[in-house]
Amino acid sequence: MPATPLKSALQIHRINNTNTATNMISHCHKQPQTATSNGGATLHRRITACCPVSAPETVGRHHTHTVGSNQCSSAVVQHIAAPVSTVWSVVRRFDNPQAYKHFLKSCHVIVGNGDVGTLREVQVVSGLPAATSTERLEILDDERHILSFSVVGGDHRLANYRSVTTLHPSSNGSGTMVVESYVVDVPSGNTKEDTCMFVDTIVRCNLQSLAQIAENLARSNRSSSLA
């Protein structure tokens, strides 16, 4: 009889050891990482904080995933010195993820017009263990700034991948805190730790790219308003 899937709740903590998985992507800043456990059951629920953060209490509600026995789950937090509205204008474009996800070459919408249920096919850059990914938009909440998608097909090794991204005003009111969490099957021949290290690296690079783009956009908007 299969074990009952466990629910992994958001736990933000400082990470204290390193892993060579981050070396695979030279332009992404390295971040120390670790894994946590709950009641003896390994959840591999980690938070990689790209800077010191104070997460709103509501964050955990959106980033609690049911984690199967052969799955891992993790999250990355990124502070961005730009308003939520500016960051959201980039994140919400389900039809244009390559705008800040530089490991994607292109995106083609297969079904839908950007509403929940829309399907997209993305082409992955060479050098990663993937070629294409077919993804379904699960949540697009413009009021609460939540986007979620799931991987439903393609040529890759990340089966049953589901991601949730939320945006929150920074506690000091000067920017945005982005939290992106995921749950994914552990590929055959890999460990939960290795899988989370790999995906964390990709997500972290994406969010660092998002920060650069949104901050540049915010500066441009400020300059235009003063002109």
Model-identified regions with their sequence ranges:
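Glycine-rich portal/gate segments that line the openings of hydrophobic small-molecule binding cavities
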Residues: 2, 79, 85, 92-159, ...
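A general secondary-structure signal for short beta-strands and their flanking turns/coil
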Residues: 69-73, 117, 130, 160, ...
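Beta-strand/loop substructures that line and gate deep hydrophobic ligand-binding cavities in soluble
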Residues: 2-5, 150-205
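Short amphipathic alpha-helical segments embedded in low-complexity Lys/Glu-rich regions
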Residues: 104-109, 195-196, 226
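Structural signal for hydrophobic/aromatic residues that build the beta-strand cores
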Residues: 87, 91, 120-122, 137, ...
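Eukaryote-biased feature marking scaffold/signaling PDZ-domain proteins and nuclear chromatin regulators
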Residues: 71-73, 82, 144, 162, ...
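Short, highly charged C-terminal tails/helix-capping segments
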Residues: 208-227
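Hydrophobic ligand-binding cavity/cleft-lining segments
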Residues: 2-115
